[in-house]
Design a protein with these regions (language model features):
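Alpha-helical transmembrane segments and their lipid-water interface positions
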Residues: 21, 32, 60-63, 89-93, ...
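Loop-to-transmembrane helix boundary motifs in multi-pass membrane proteins
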Residues: 10, 15, 130-134, 221-225, ...
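Short amphipathic alpha-helical coupling elements at transmembrane boundaries
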Residues: 68, 75-82, 89, 120, ...
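Select transmembrane alpha-helical segments in multipass membrane proteins
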Residues: 11-22, 85-98, 132-136, 190-203, ...
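Lipid-exposed faces of alpha-helical membrane segments in multi-pass integral membrane proteins
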Residues: 23, 27, 47, 51-55, ...
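Membrane-interface "cap" regions at the ends of multi-pass membrane proteins
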Residues: 1-36, 40-44, 57-64, 72-73
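Helix-loop-helix junctions that connect adjacent transmembrane segments
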Residues: 3-10, 45-46, 122-129, 156-283
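Hydrophobic transmembrane alpha-helices that form the core helical bundles
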Residues: 36-40, 49, 57-137, 141-145, ...
Length: 337
């Protein structure tokens, strides 16, 4: 695909970059820990995944439909304000914005944690780790001050790189799959309904970010067409990666060991391919964190800009640079993070 076909007009992102924003923001650090949490329930967790995917699919369809009807930046905030008024819109914008920049701090810390595999000096040194995490936040803030296209390129590259370990385990990992790890199907001692409900709740937070492409809609080429396609494609890619890779890990590692694993994907890779594969997973996890950080930092500037344009946030948040970047919201949120 040519550069022009993906970007449309200058300064906007196309289908692939919008899709990478969805996939990249969804697949942060959490997916690399989720198999251990689900191992407490056993193979029945696959049903929790399926119910959660079904619910996320309906939610994605709602966002896709709304993005065709309301072509303005802001995503969930804009849709809430349009449907329920200024007060509801403000509450959604305020709560969502806080969740973004506070979550960014956690993502940065998690990314530094994975980097410690390669840089032992980060282990047991909270001050150094904090400084590196702060540095990561400001590095991606700097990237986000350049242009939406540059942010999109970084997002696309990090997304492609970080899904490689998930694809490897979600495909080749099944060559080492032991079906006995799924017997009995329910390890929790609870009823099947309770186990499925619990695993669905655990899986649900892995789908945070499916709405990402709707927020910078005025920076998306032909948004009424691109955003629905990117949202559905991004959700589908992430869901397939989640289910395949998680089931593979559960089939590789004995349930009793998996429940206590601090790095289930790395442990599974080590069992299958050796120590070098564990390092590959750690690198993928670090890139996953920093790729998600890049995408969420983009949104931390776009959301308050949309609210400021409609006089629900201070007008200064609507100011943009020559590149069309809402620099005040971007910088202020990074300071808070």
């Amino acid at each position: 695909m040519s550069q022009k076909s993906n970007s449309g007009e200058t300064g906007k992102i196309g289908f692939w970059m919008s899709t990478s924003l969805v996939v990249g923001n969804m697949t942060g650090s959490g997916i690399f820990l989720l198999p251990a949490a689900l191992a407490l329930y056993g193979g029945i967790s696959i049903f929790g995944w399926l119910f959660t995917v079904l619910g996320a699919l309906f939610l994605a369809l709602v966002f896709s439909r709304l993005s065709r009807l309301i072509i303005r930046a802001g995503g969930p905030y804009t849709y809430a304000r349009e449907g329920f008024g200024d007060l509801t819109g403000f509450m959604v914008a305020w709560g969502y914005w806080i969740s973004i920049w506070s979550g960014n701090a956690a993502i940065a810390v998690a990314g530094v944690g994975y980097l410690s595999v390669f840089f032992p000096a980060l282990k047991g040194n909270p001050m150094l780790s904090a400084l590196v995490a702060i540095g990561a936040i400001w590095l991606f803030t700097f990237i986000n001050t350049k242009s939406i296209r540059k942010v999109g390129v970084v997002q696309l590259l990090t997304t492609v790189i970080k899904i490689v370990p998930l694809i490897l385990l979600g495909t080749l990992g099944f060559l080492h799959f032991n079906k006995e790890h799924f017997v009995p199907l329910n390890l929790s001692g609870e009823s099947g309904f309770d186990a499925i409900t619990a695993t669905a709740a655990l899986a649900l937070w892995a789908f945070l970010g499916l709405e990402s492409a709707t927020i910078p809609s005025d920076k998306v080429d032909t948004p009424e067409r691109t955003i629905p396609r990117a949202t559905m494609a991004g959700l589908s890619i992430a869901a397939l990666l989640y289910i395949a890779s998680t089931m593979a890990v559960m089939g590789i590692i004995v349930p009793a060991d998996l429940q206590h694993s601090a790095a289930p994907f790395a442990d599974a890779a080590r069992l299958v391919w050796g120590e070098w594969a564990s390092a590959l997973i750690a690198a993928g996890a670090a890139i996953a964190c920093f790729g998600a950080l890049n995408g969420w930092i983009l949104l931390q500037g776009q959301l308050p800009m949309a609210a400021a344009r409609e006089k629900l946030f201070p007008a200064s948040f609507a100011r943009v640079s020559k590149q069309g970047i809402p620099f005040l919201g971007l910088l202020f949120a990074s300071v808070l993070a």
